[in-house]
Design a protein with these regions (language model features):
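Positively charged, low-complexity intrinsically disordered regions
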Residues: 8, 87-90, 176, 182
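Generic alpha-helical secondary structure signal
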Residues: 51-58, 110-114, 185
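Small/polar-rich, solvent-exposed N-terminal microdomains that initiate assembly or binding
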Residues: 50-82
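Single conserved hydrophobic/aromatic residue that forms the stacking wall/gate
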Residues: 169-186
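Residue microenvironments linked to proteolytic maturation
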Residues: 6, 13, 33, 69-73, ...
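Polar/acidic, low-complexity leader/linker segments enriched in S/T/G and N/D
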Residues: 1-62
Length: 186
């Protein structure tokens, strides 16, 4: 098996994207929907077994729950590092529902976040795409193993057929208004 940099994309309709608002005037903008699909061959000719997605989704959600900021970008860079000048959103939670990994992403008031917000509010259907690493079967099946999600990026043309999250405008809960925790360094 060969270890690879893996990017997967889902369209707006495929991801069943929702738009949420909360924050300024009680409204911040969120995208919510499918981030990665399991058990099906995607446009990149890869198949992510459901157990691989479940494990990767849990690991990423554990990082978020521990207080780490998981940031995403507009489009995919050619490597796994996060480029702060391209950040558009922060993933606030990830979970599994059936064979799919879902996520909720807060659109940030960065230049790239403003670009995403303007497009979404103008009716552009943006998709999302997971970015991570893993091994791919060398015998042509396209099956991925040892998958680790680094982040989920906003893209124009996702490879996963259901990765078009919806937009949400929601009000902050009292929990959201409390002091945030920073992870301690070891």
């Amino acid at each position: 098996m060969t270890s690879l940099y893996l990017r997967e994309n889902l369209t707006f309709d495929q991801a069943r994207v929702q738009v949420l608002h909360e924050g300024k005037d009680g409204k911040d903008l969120y995208m919510k929907g499918i981030c990665i699909q399991g058990g099906i061959k995607n446009a990149n000719q890869r198949v992510y077994p459901v157990q691989e997605i479940a494990k990767a989704t849990k690991t990423l959600n554990d990082q978020i729950s521990s207080g780490y900021s998981v940031l995403g970008e507009v489009d995919h860079p050619d490597d796994l590092k996060i480029n702060l000048d391209r950040v558009s959103h922060m993933i606030t939670e990830m979970w599994m529902d059936g064979p799919n990994g879902y996520g909720k992403m807060k659109i940030l008031p960065t230049p790239m976040g403003q670009l995403v917000k303007t497009m979404l509010e103008s009716g552009v259907k943006l998709g999302v795409s997971s970015r991570g690493s893993g091994n791919m079967n060398e015998y042509g099946s396209g099956e991925v193993s040892d998958f680790e999600i680094i982040t989920v990026d906003v893209v124009a043309q996702p490879s996963a057929p259901g990765a078009y999250p919806c937009l949400l405008y929601t009000s902050p809960s009292p929990r959201d208004l409390s002091t945030s925790r920073m992870p301690s360094s070891a």
